[in-house]
Design a protein with these regions (language model features):
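A short, solvent-exposed loop/turn motif at the edges and junctions
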Residues: 27-33, 56-74
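Membrane-proximal, glycine/serine-rich, low-complexity loop/turn segments characteristic
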Residues: 2, 65, 75, 81, ...
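Short, ordered, surface-exposed loop/turn motifs in non-cytosolic proteins
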Residues: 14-29, 52, 110
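Surface-exposed extracellular loop regions of Gram-negative outer-membrane beta-barrel proteins
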Residues: 523, 556-602, 622-654, 740, ...
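Outer membrane beta-barrel strand-and-loop segments of large Gram-negative receptors
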Residues: 432-434, 480-488, 592, 596, ...
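Surface-exposed loop/turn segments flanking beta-strands in extracellular/periplasmic regions
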Residues: 274-294, 343-352, 401-421, 459-487, ...
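Signature of Gram-negative outer-membrane beta-barrel scaffolds
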Residues: 422, 448-555, 702-703, 707
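Short, acidic Ser/Thr/Gly-rich low-complexity loop/linker segments typical of extracellular
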Residues: 29-45
Length: 833
């Protein structure tokens, strides 16, 4: 039977804003019997097919008067497509101006292959950055060094709006500190991704979704934010400055018409953090201590950031759209550390002070082009996305030490006093291109095929030059020279090309499945520009990555999921580059050009129970890793160098330093249990709590003298939301990390609590918020390392509590609707399915 199409757009008659989920019913002229129907999309548009004939078109939406198109719609060979244009519907008489829909999303939404954590209403991260947002996400943690972990593993792929974070800015720590929390809408946690996603990351993917649009309304819409704060001055220890300020502001605007959407956003400010640390380091030779260091460190890190994004999306018709955007992101990071050391040697006492200063400035350009093609068949879609970025980072570092040998063999000699300066000049360039094409083809009513290509090409260039200034014992003068051992100019090229396909759908009302396969080719070439023949690495390989997801819905309240995926963790440029990075406390690190990727087989079984006031999610997961990558440390000397660092030139000037690098082990195993609970205690009070418990085992290798090593780790998070009268909201959250064991290191427990209060003002167009971070000043990290060559205990804490005060204002604050749970007059809504 020949069919035609009826299309149009639904708008609110007063505000002019599009209405999503309005019911469009196609009725017979003779008896008004329902023939077919649909619902409107987010931009108000709809399209419905019907057999040739004459029809009435009725539009209805809860809280609005029903609308019947005044003209009979006739579909036939001469008029196979009828465009109704703009349809305006009016609010019902009982709909009052001040009443709004409060369709609050739950904090955690569960989908077939991911969890979506809605953080746009999170108060404890308000006034902060994306780092603060991630700290509130169940199963995710961020330590003092900015390392992001998922279920205790740092092997996690971090994306920004579905693109690798390297496309968006500098290193991950800096980038997260440069993204305001107010710009983050949600965080997707994908612990066992399908073949559609990049297989990089042993423990999964964290996708930070930024707010692209402020509203779906026509006309000009936007939101502005301003936050200021810092730690309490009387909690800041000397010699740090008493005022460590934080100030951040942002504005986001978009202008929408029926044919296009223009958007602009800008943010900037300063984020400063202070920390205090204490270390005890004992170095051993032949089982006996030959030095004992006591080190106190006081640091302050300042991030000065700014970004601007401008772009537009053009709608050719209801099926085709093109988006073009440009983003400029820049910033400057400054870090100063004051270090005081007291070193007990076997032949004397050495005191020294050290001042470390590091500055770097970065500029990043990101260009994005996206195309979306929707077909007549529902859910059939073609998308293409290309992103190109250019980054330039220029840095300078100074490490200044003043030594004083107070006693040598029991006698003080001022001639042994020393001065030492290490200066770094670095300049890094990074170009990257990411291309993704995805096609979705539905078939057999409930099934769909999804296939595509994803390619990523990286061209980083790292250039770091080191200079030293030392005291000459003979001339008693200072001399400066170029440190060729530590200097590096490393050029790197990496390409990854992948083809993937997934097939998924429903067997019946209870059982759903999705199977996929991704095949990738990876190629990398890295070399030192000054020594290309000797200091180089070249690798290439083909690898398959199969995935499988099964879901069984017992009833509306109970469901189960089983999944499998093969994952990979590839070495990064800095993991492979064998240049020496010498740091305070006689420590240094370097890359391993012989490092190979690790591969993981990941299994998960989850159960979700959804009741009236409860949602309980439980998950058991198991990961088996081959060729496991791990960081390994030892005391640098000629004997250890031959065993662990055959690719590094030996230098006696670093004898006694603690050296760390990357090594491949044999196998690793992880088994864990995860529990996430959402509880609506009262109408105005809800709680979210999560617990993660897992055990890891490292299979015996030569590094472990062919012995296995196991450790157990646990962590938990708790969040309480209270919505009080007169538009007050209070949020309290706490986190706890139990002690855990790594290959050579035991981490100490860590815990802290945050408190936030919000008040809506100016008829809910404005919001005032107050946040107190780490209210009990317990936040900090620590670890201890015990080997045959080194005993080390390190503790550090951030300067807290911190207080942040912020204000947010919404421009043209969206569509006002009647709550669905209130009584209303008959709107004529009907179920068209």
């Amino acid at each position: 039977m020949a069919q035609g199409k009826i299309s149009g757009r639904v708008y609110d008659s007063k505000s002019g804003q599009p209405i999503e989920y309005a019911t469009i019913a196609v009725l017979k002229v003779q008896d008004s019997a329902l023939v077919t129907g649909t619902v409107s999309e987010s931009n108000g548009s709809f399209e419905v097919t019907a057999p040739y004939g004459k029809y009435l078109v009725r539009v209805s939406f809860m809280g609005y008067k029903p609308y019947v198109h005044p003209e009979t719609v006739t579909l036939g060979e001469r008029h196979a497509t009828v465009k109704l244009g703009k349809i305006q519907i009016s609010p019902s008489a009982v709909m009052m101006e001040e009443v709004q829909v409060r369709a609050e999303r739950t904090m955690v939404e569960y989908q077939l292959d991911k969890r979506v954590v809605n953080v746009d209403k999170n108060l404890v991260s308000s006034g902060g950055t994306a780092t603060d947002v991630l700290e509130t996400v169940p199963s995710v943690s961020v330590d003092n060094d900015g390392t992001v972990t998922l279920r205790g593993s740092s092997s996690v792929k971090v994306l920004i709006n579905g693109r690798p974070y390297e496309m968006m800015g500098n290193d991950l720590e800096t980038l997260l500190e440069q993204i305001p929390a107010s710009s983050v809408e949600s965080v997707e946690v994908i612990t066992n991704p399908s073949a559609k996603y990049d297989p990089e990351g042993m423990s999964g993917i964290i996708n930070i979704k930024l707010k692209e649009k402020t509203s779906g309304a026509l006309g000009l819409n936007g939101v502005a934010n301003l936050n200021i704060g810092g730690p309490l001055p009387f909690m800041v220890p000397d010699p740090l400055p008493k005022i460590i300020p934080t100030a951040m502001g942002s504005i986001s605007l978009n202008y929408t018409t029926e044919k296009y959407n223009l958007f602009f956003s800008a943010d900037g400010g300063q984020r400063s953090r202070g920390s205090q640390g204490h270390s005890n380091i004992e170095r051993l030779r032949h089982g006996s201590a030959w030095s004992h260091d006591t080190i106190d460190q006081y640091s302050i890190r300042g991030n000065y950031m700014g970004s601007m994004k401008v772009g537009g999306e053009y709608y050719f018709d209801s099926k085709n759209s093109l988006l073009l955007s440009y983003q400029l992101r820049g910033g400057k990071r400054h870090r100063t550390s004051n270090i005081f050391s007291h070193d007990l040697l076997t032949d004397g006492i050495l005191d020294y002070t050290q001042l470390d200063t590091n500055d770097n400035a970065n500029v990043n350009h990101v260009f994005n082009l996206s195309y979306i093609k929707k077909f007549d068949e529902k859910d059939r879609e073609l998308t293409a996305d290309a992103t190109f970025s250019m980054r330039h980072v220029k840095g300078n570092g100074w490490q200044e030490q003043s030594f004083r040998d107070t006693l040598i063999n029991g006698i003080y000699n001022p001639m042994w006093d020393r001065y030492y300066l290490r200066q770094t000049e670095s300049e890094n360039h990074h170009k990257a291109l990411n291309i993704k094409v995805n096609y979705v083809h539905p078939f057999a009513e409930t099934w769909k095929l999804e296939t595509g290509y994803e390619g990523r090409m990286d061209w980083p260039d790292q250039n770091a030059v080191y200079f030293r200034t030392e005291y000459d014992d003979l001339t008693h003068t200072l001399f400066r020279y170029h440190d060729t051992i530590s200097s590096t100019h490393f050029n790197y090229t990496q390409q990854t090309h992948g083809l993937y396909a997934t097939v998924g759908g429903k067997f019946n009302d209870h059982l759903s499945a999705q199977a996929g396969l991704r095949v990738e080719y990876s190629y990398l070439l890295g070399y030192d520009v000054n020594h290309p023949a000797t200091d180089s690495v070249r690798k290439s390989y083909w690898e398959p990555y199969p995935t499988l997801h099964l879901s069984y819905e017992i009833n509306k309240s109970n469901s189960m999921q089983l999944s499998y995926s093969r994952r990979v963790r590839r070495p990064h440029m800095w993991d492979l580059n064998p240049y020496l990075d010498v740091r305070e406390g006689q420590e240094m690190s370097f890359g391993n050009p012989n490092l190979d990727p690790e591969f993981t087989n990941a299994f998960e079984f989850s159960y979700n129970l959804s009741l009236d006031k409860w949602n309980i999610y439980t998950c058991a997961y198991y990961r088996q890793t081959n060729n496991m990558m791990t960081r390994y440390g030892y005391v640098w000397d000629s004997v250890s160098h031959q065993r662990y660092s055959w690719w590094m030139p030996y230098s006696s000037q670093y004898d006694g330093y603690w050296a760390s690098t990357w090594q491949n082990l044999d196998k690793g195993y992880n088994f864990g249990l995860e529990l996430i609970v959402d509880w609506q205690v009262l109408k105005w009070w809800k709680i979210n709590a999560s617990i993660n418990l897992y055990r890891s085992t490292i299979e015996g290798t030569a590094l472990l003298d062919n012995k296995s090593q196991s450790a157990t780790q646990a962590s938990g998070k708790f969040t309480s939301f209270m919505t009080l009268p007169n538009d007050w909201t209070i949020q309290f959250s706490g986190q706890y990390f139990a002690p855990w064991l790594d290959l050579q290191t035991t981490m100490f427990p860590a815990y802290w609590c945050d408190l936030a209060v919000k008040k809506d003002v100016l008829q809910k167009r404005g919001t005032i918020n107050l946040r107190i971070g780490d209210i009990f000043a317990t936040g900090g990290w620590g670890h201890e390392t015990y080997t045959e060559q080194l005993n080390r205990v390190v503790r550090s804490r951030r300067i807290s509590p911190t207080i942040t005060i912020g204000f947010s204002y919404k421009i043209n604050n969206g569509l006002k609707q009647k709550p669905q749970n209130e009584e209303e007059e008959d709107s004529g809504s009907e179920n068209v399915y």
